[in-house]
Amino acid sequence: GSGGATNGFDATGTNNPSLFTFNNPSGVWEVVSNTNSNTLTAGTAYRLMVRGDRTINLSSNTPTPTTTILRATGSLKTGNFTPTLNQTADGYSFVGNPYQAPIDIKAVLSASSNMNPDVTYYWDPTLNTRGGFVTRDLSLNSNSVASNFNQYLQPGQAVFVKKANTNLTASMTITE
């Protein structure tokens, strides 16, 4: 990321950003510029570009991925979580699982107001050679492509959800 090690990222030749959040109200990706002063928050969905272990040649645009382990520390989230949502009709919001236990996103969407309860969009890193999106039809319990993703959002996992095609206010509460 920008500033390399000074801002809490591994230094690279370009120091291009590798950690992003999705601004749900505006529908745009935003760079996380510093992990030393910006604490990652449970429930906030992040897009992280993982290159693999530190032996990867960063001068190549297509290095072979390597296995790596990411570790998180901090306090466990307890209590209800209410994400800020995109209020545009058919607007997308990126929502993360705030807990260290799976959540049933189908049940969450069914209990939400003015959200599309039938569809979610997951990133599956095992598709193709670099990953790809999977559309999960919750009403049919099926995926758009062969993928192991289901309605249970795992700890540390995020998903795009869609607002219903309405001008009414959408709301969602994820309960523990």
Where are these regions (language model features)?
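N-terminal exported-region signature
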Residues: 1-176
